[in-house]
C-alpha cells in the first residue's frame, strides 16, 4: 500500500492539469512553493486523494512518511535548477518483438509502465529522462558489464535492467529523443540522490549508445524463456523471493 500511495500522489502532483496541453512545465519556483507550509498541505491533499483512489483507509503514519518522501523528490528536482517539462506520468508503453521459440517464430508483446517521463536541459543538451521511482533501500546506480544486468545472481543489477527495458520501449516511440534512464531512490540521502545511471563512471545520458547491445541480450533472454526444450525453472537466487507476492 505504501508504494501505491507514493506513486499515485507523485503522479497527480506532477501530471499535466486541465489547463495544460499534453505537457506541463514544472519551474524551480513551483517546486520551492511546495516546500512551504502551504505546499505541505497541498502535498498531503494529493496523498489523501491517493488513499481514496486506492480505496484504502487513511493512515497518519503513512501520510507522514509519504509526505517526507515526496518532499525529498521535490528537493531532488529543485536541485536541478532548471524547468522540467513533464511528458507523462505512469505512462504505459508497448512494443512487439519477434522471438524464435524452438522451430518457429512468435510475436511477443513487451509492456511497461514508466513512473515519469520528462525533459530537461543539461549543459545545453536536451535530455528526455525515463525515471523509475524506488522507495526501497538505495542500490548502486552503476553497472560494469552486460553480465551484471542479465546473469541471475545476488549482485544482479535488475533495477538497472528494468529502466533499460523501459528505455528500449520508449526508444521505439521516440526514436529521435536523447533518452536517459534514471533511478530515483527516494530514501537516500540528499547528496547521493543523483538519478542518473553510470557505466565505468560515465553518466548515461544517451541510451542509444547502449540500445543495440541491450536489445541483443534481451533477445537472447527471451528466446531462452520461450525455448520449449529448456525447463522453465525458478530463479536460483532465493533471496529475490523474500518479497515476492506469490511466495505463499
Located regions from the model:
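A non-catalytic, helix-rich entry segment at domain boundaries
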Residues: 8-97, 202-205
Amino acid at each position: 500500500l505504501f508504494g501505491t500511495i507514493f506513486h499515485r500522489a507523485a503522479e497527480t502532483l506532477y501530471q499535466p492539469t486541465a489547463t495544460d496541453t499534453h505537457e506541463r512545465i514544472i519551474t524551480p519556483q513551483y517546486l520551492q512553493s511546495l516546500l512551504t507550509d502551504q505546499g505541505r498541505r497541498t502535498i498531503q491533499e494529493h496523498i489523501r486523494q491517493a488513499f481514496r483512489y486506492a480505496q484504502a483507509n487513511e493512515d497518519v503514519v503513512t501520510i507522514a512518511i509519504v509526505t517526507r518522501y515526496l518532499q525529498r523528490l521535490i528537493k531532488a528536482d529543485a536541485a536541478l535548477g532548471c524547468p522540467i517539462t513533464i511528458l507523462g506520468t505512469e505512462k504505459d508503453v508497448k512494443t512487439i518483438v519477434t522471438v524464435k521459440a524452438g522451430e518457429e517464430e512468435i510475436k511477443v508483446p513487451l509492456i511497461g509502465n514508466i513512473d515519469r517521463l520528462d525533459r530537461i536541459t543539461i549543459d545545453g543538451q536536451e535530455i528526455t529522462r525515463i525515471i523509475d521511482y524506488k522507495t526501497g533501500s538505495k542500490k548502486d546506480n552503476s553497472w560494469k558489464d552486460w553480465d551484471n544486468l542479465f546473469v541471475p545472481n545476488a549482485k544482479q543489477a535488475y533495477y538497472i535492467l528494468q529502466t533499460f527495458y523501459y528505455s528500449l520501449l520508449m526508444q521505439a516511440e521516440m526514436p529521435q529523443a536523447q533518452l536517459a534512464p534514471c533511478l530515483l531512490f527516494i530514501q537516500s540521502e540528499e547528496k547521493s540522490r543523483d538519478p542518473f545511471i553510470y557505466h565505468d563512471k560515465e553518466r548515461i545520458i544517451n541510451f542509444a549508445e547502449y540500445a543495440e547491445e541491450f536489445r541483443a541480450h534481451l533477445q537472447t533472454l527471451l528466446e531462452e524463456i520461450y525455448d520449449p526444450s529448456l525447463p522453465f525453472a525458478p530463479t536460483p537466487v532465493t533471496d529475490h523471493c523474500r518479497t515476492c507476492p506469490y511466495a505463499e
